């Protein structure tokens, strides 16, 4: 779990996301409160529940990006799901309990990776012995030591070996009919529990054998029960769920029809967000202290179209404003992995140096604003479309222009997209 202060979290998010200070502050405080809760007296700890957040803002302003960056910062089990993927219990589709099951899988993966790091040296030694067994046969001989030296020097990397590895795939998945709350079951996992796990012969090179062997040997050294318990505790107390597209399951007051699935999904989300116990194959998980961050554009529906009970369970509301022309310009240049830098890095692999003048950046931002205003406002995503159109010809001929420096100026941008941006009908289909 991260121990960044709210100010540090915001400054970290500033490296990748332009603007939206209020939203950044809200998620930073919510994240810091997880850390604070662990330090309050035990009798009060269970009473401190997370304050769930609702991010409201038009498409392409950075709601999902905030969640993605927060996940990397949090060092906690994180799951991003689209609310539209779920249906109410009894209908075909995934039910919302699957969110918690997926969160537990994420926590297990985190804990397993951390614990594997602790036994890596022993696992590597055991993997080396198994590779030597495959190369020379078991037993300690002079030939084995000779092979060991060659193996460590990398001389045997391309040599093919035959290994017995645990059979992890190919079991097939199926869903129990008539059991709406049941998860999808993996047949190979069921067989493993009956027969103690099957092995399968794999033919691979020495260099390709290292990763699966180290993973298998690490798992033998780990206490699986303790690992599972730690993962469940981590998911319960530090888990974060980002519910995207929540507005798509809100029933607009003007909309007719049955809307069986929309309202049903909201009703199913209520106990999950409020706090319930979900059974998983690793054991029961309480959702009382899982932080939920919901987001939606709310173009058609309004936040008030959500069920009142669900609105009450998302007490912190943050509105993200639409992006201005200055914001779009900053997005092109300020974030660490900005779009222009990405294009420059891609073309540099071909030996082409791409340079954008300040006027060219202004022209791209102006074109994005114009097309967003005349066609459909998709926010910063419009920049990707326009930049792709601008560098399309350069990318196509880059392989033949190694060693060249290509300067993109305002005239070049106008020549590539000027007519398209001006013509609303063409923009609708091309930009």
Swiss-Prot record:
GO terms for cellular component: HslUV protease complex. It is found in: Cytoplasm. ATP binds at residues 18, 60-65, 244, 309, 381. Its main location: cytoplasm. One of its GO terms (molecular function) is proteasome-activating activity. It comes from the Bacteria. The keyword Cytoplasm applies. Pfam families: AAA, AAA_2, ClpB_D2-small. InterPro entries: AAA+_ATPase, ATP-dep_Clp_protease_ClpX, ATPase_AAA_core, Clp_ATPase_C, HslU, P-loop_NTPase. GO terms for biological process: protein unfolding; proteolysis involved in protein catabolic process. Keywords: ATP-binding, Chaperone, Cytoplasm, Nucleotide-binding, Stress response. Belongs to the ClpX chaperone family. HslU subfamily. A double ring-shaped homohexamer of HslV is capped on each side by a ring-shaped HslU homohexamer. The assembly of the HslU/HslV complex is dependent on binding of ATP. ATPase subunit of a proteasome-like degradation complex; this subunit has chaperone activity. The binding of ATP and its subsequent hydrolysis by HslU are essential for unfolding of protein substrates subsequently hydrolyzed by HslV. HslU recognizes the N-terminal part of its protein substrates and unfolds these before they are guided to HslV for hydrolysis. NCBIfam families: hslU (TIGR00390), PRK05201.1 (NF003544). This is ATP-dependent protease ATPase subunit HslU. It comes from Caulobacter sp. (strain K31). The gene is hslU.
């Amino acid at each position: 779990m991260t121990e960044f202060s709210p100010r540090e979290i915001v400054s970290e998010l500033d490296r990748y996301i332009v603007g939206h200070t209020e939203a950044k502050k809200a998620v930073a405080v919510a994240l810091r409160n997880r850390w604070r809760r662990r330090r309050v007296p035990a009798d009060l700890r269970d009473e401190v529940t997370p304050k769930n957040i609702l991010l409201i803002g038009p498409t392409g302003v950075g709601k999902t990006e905030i969640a993605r960056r927060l996940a990397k910062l949090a060092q906690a089990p994180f799951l991003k799901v689209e609310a539209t993927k779920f249906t109410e219990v009894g209908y075909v589709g995934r039910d919302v309990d699957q969110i918690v099951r997926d969160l537990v899988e994420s926590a297990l993966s985190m804990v397993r990776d951390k614990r594997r790091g602790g036994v890596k040296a022993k696992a590597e030694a055991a993997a080396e012995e198994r590779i030597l067994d495959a190369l020379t046969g078991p037993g300690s001989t002079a030939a084995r030591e000779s092979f060991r030296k060659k193996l460590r020097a990398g001389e045997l990397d391309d040599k093919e070996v035959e290994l017995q590895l645990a059979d992890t795939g190919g079991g097939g998945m199926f869903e129990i009919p008539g059991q709406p709350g049941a998860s999808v079951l993996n047949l190979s996992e069921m067989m493993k529990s009956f027969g103690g796990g099957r092995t399968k012969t794999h033919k691979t090179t020495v260099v390709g054998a290292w990763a699966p062997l180290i993973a298998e040997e690490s798992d033998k050294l780990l206490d699986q029960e303790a690992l599972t318990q730690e993962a469940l505790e981590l998911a319960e107390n530090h888990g974060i769920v980002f519910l995207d597209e929540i507005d798509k399951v809100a029933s607009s007051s003007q909309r007719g029809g049955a809307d069986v699935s929309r309202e049903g999904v909201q009703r199913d989300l209520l106990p999950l967000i409020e706090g319930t116990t979900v059974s998983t194959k690793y054991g029961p998980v309480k959702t009382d202290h899982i932080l939920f961050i919901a987001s939606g554009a709310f173009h058609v529906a309004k936040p008030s179209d959500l069920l009142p009970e669900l609105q009450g369970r998302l007490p912190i509301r943050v509105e993200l404003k639409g992006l201005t022309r200055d914001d779009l310009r900053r997005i092109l240049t300020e974030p660490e992995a900005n779009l222009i830098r990405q294009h420059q890095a891609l073309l540099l692999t071909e030996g082409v140096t791409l340079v954008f003048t300040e006027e060219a950046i202004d022209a791209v931002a102006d074109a994005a604003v114009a097309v967003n205003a005349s066609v459909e406002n998709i926010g910063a995503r419009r920049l990707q479309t326009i930049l792709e159109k601008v560098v399309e010809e350069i990318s196509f001929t880059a392989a033949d222009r190694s060693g060249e420096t290509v300067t993109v100026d305002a005239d070049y941008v106008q020549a590539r997209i000027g007519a398209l941006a001006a013509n609303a009908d063409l923009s609708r289909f091309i930009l």
